[in-house]
Amino acid sequence: MTASVKEGAHSEVLDKRRVNTKLGQKITANSLSSDANSSMNSKRLGLGIARRPGDNLLASISDNYGGKYEVSGENMTELPQPRGLFIHRNDRPISDDSIVTKNSELFSSGFSDDNNSGASSVETDELSSEGGINLGLNNLTVGPIASDEHNMDGSFISDNFEESFISTDSVSTLHIPNENRNHDKSFSYENGPQSRAHKMISTNTTSSTINANNMKSTGTLPPFRPRSNSYSSKHLGTSTLYDHSNSTSAILPNKQHYLTPSQRYRMRKERNDTSLRNSIRKKERFYDEQEPNMELQEGDIDDSLIWNIPMASFSTNSFLMSSGDPKHVRSHQSKPQPRFPQRHNFGSVPHFQPPLMSSALDFKAMPTSPVPGIDSTSDLQFIRETTENLSSVYLQSSNRLSRSKLLERTDSAEVLPIEFKEASEKGMEDLILVSEDKLDVVSHSRPSWLPPKDPEEKKLHENQISKSMSIASFEQLDRNKESEERHIQDETNRQKYVLLLDRGVTRNSSIQSLKKMIWETPLTVDTRWSIYDQLLQSDVRLISEQYIESFEQIMQVLNKMEFPRNKETEIEKLIDNSIKNKISGKQNISNDLLLMLQLKSISHQGLIPGDELLFHHFLTDPSTNQSLQHVWELVNLIQLTCFNDFTKEKYDIKIVEPRGVVSKYLSQDDSFKSEFNTSCLNSTTWWNILERVDHNLFMWIMDIIVVANSQCFKNYPINREKFKNKSWEYYKSKKVIVEYKVLASFALNVLLNYHFGFNDLISITTLEDKSFCIPMPLDNLFDEGYINNVFIRKWLHYYKKF
């Protein structure tokens, strides 16, 4: 016995210097054996002698107590080999201990370093006063605490056990309710190298015991609950752990034992695996809760398909354990259960362990996702059929959505803005691809096939466009209002023309009214011929009878003679240059134009500038009723009175007069220096302007010129006898007005406001553009009446300056 004590002391010294000490301790107590058996069992207890972790006393115990307290295999299962103790980390490594083994972090985990070294000491604890019931076992074996996650059959341990296992610094105290509150002995195990005290409290040996046979027959496990920082094993029995006080076994609780490297390795591995699995499951539950089902929110899936959701069916629980007891079905809301840290012993009372075939996971829960390096099973293996069904539903809904969108785009293509349709006709846009989002981005001020504008730029441009459109709208409203007023005014003036003609246009009051109204409204077709005739020669018509050759006579002369071919060619060329190649050529040219020019060429006055234009416009104007005689008389009358030699001469002088009105305006712009001369500004080039004037404006211009050359024949009548046998020069000096101002103001208006597309009044006749017109028509913006009215008002403005 003394040798054993010395040997144990020597072993204690060696344990402090050894890096990893092999733990092999087994305390066997049998209340039914004799003192000799107790002494023999005491000798079999480890006294600090190094032992292999694989040595198991199960065989020897089975030989001694085989079959005496057998445990039913239906409810109990054998625990695996011990892997490690619940230990505390030393603040400092023990001398000659392995620092690398304890701190090398072989398995990266938040729990890999916790309690990787330490020792377990067996101490007695007084727990009888705490309400805990000590259970006296026939045979009590204290050894390395198993921390394996799996049972021997490979089934999973519940999370409740894992959670209890993670808290390694505290081992729960087991409380077993029983009718008998008396205790023999209680043992308390506290981890840590500083814990070396062992206390043993002897209790009444006659206390009531738990019959092992009763435990065997019932096969049920008493309930238990965890406690922190200590683990107490309370047993009910009639015999103590040590039958002899002088036994060397009494000093065993004072012995300090450490975990071996393999035990620490297994413990760290189990902690890493447990932590990793818990983390994976928590993340899976989190993402399953956070992931929304957008397709169901769209309402595109029928209610009959709602059942087809990706979840595990009953066929996917092959990897789970069948639950024989519904009480042990795993639930996240259930109360955590501790892992019972006791190795199975056939000779002891059954320890508290989940029964065989108990389920650690809920078979209704989703299967865990595969973990790289741990599980090689694919998660798609369990939901393959479900994913195929969902894929078909998604494809079907996608096709249905595509068809509906295509039909919607096709219908909306008919009501798209005009710019998209124009771009589609040019091949620059596909109407089916135009969505509502594109309509919001595309700007009307930029083609749709170009990159869209910046939002701020688009907003700025739209504001400017809106402002311009507003101004244009107001202007258009003003023009519309003005057009209505002008239309009313024209109707009123036309009625006044008729009244004035009935009353007599040669009266002074009538002439003043005419000179005012003619700038507002042109003469009507019905009144033009009569007013021209009365204003230029009064009712006496002395000029037509005495100074204009009769149309019948000149016609007879032309019929009797053979008109020279070269003269005829010159007349045709004149028609082409002055009429056909100009804006007037757009109208129908009368077949009698050549005849009228031939007659004029053989007359006493001959062809003079402007004859071709006057004949052409009067032949096409309904006011003359296409009467050749009326046209003949009217053209000659205008040439003799309005464009006589005195008027032309006066115009040629005043148009280039250095101190005149025209010079005053043109001298303000240096660009008119090359144009302000007699070669460019004369009575002949004046007619070049009229070649570029359309018919309606030409007739209005003639109306103004005729009214400007009118006389008050009512107060100063023409005496036929006075001018009988008098020459035209005499009559002209007495009864013809020289009115050059209206002609000069007309030319000044064109030079200042309509000098576009030509260099001077000479080159204007040589322009090849047949459609060139003064003023230029703007059919898309303004009507012809408005443009002509603006031209006349500007002309009136300059006419008043003379």
From Swiss-Prot:
UniProt KW keywords: Cell wall biogenesis/degradation, Cytoplasm, Golgi apparatus, Protein transport, Transport
Question: Per the UniProt entry, what are the Gene Ontology biological process annotations, in alphabetical order?
Answer: fungal-type cell wall organization; protein transport
Chain positions covered by the region annotation Disordered: 207-230, 323-345
In terms of domain of life, where is this protein from? Eukaryota
Q: Lyase: is it a keyword of this entry? A: no
**InterPro entries listed in its UniProt record:** Sbe2/Sbe22_C, SBE2/SBE22_M, SBE2/SBE22_N
The UniProt family comment states:
Belongs to the SBE2 family.
Indicate what this protein is called per its UniProt record.
Protein SBE22
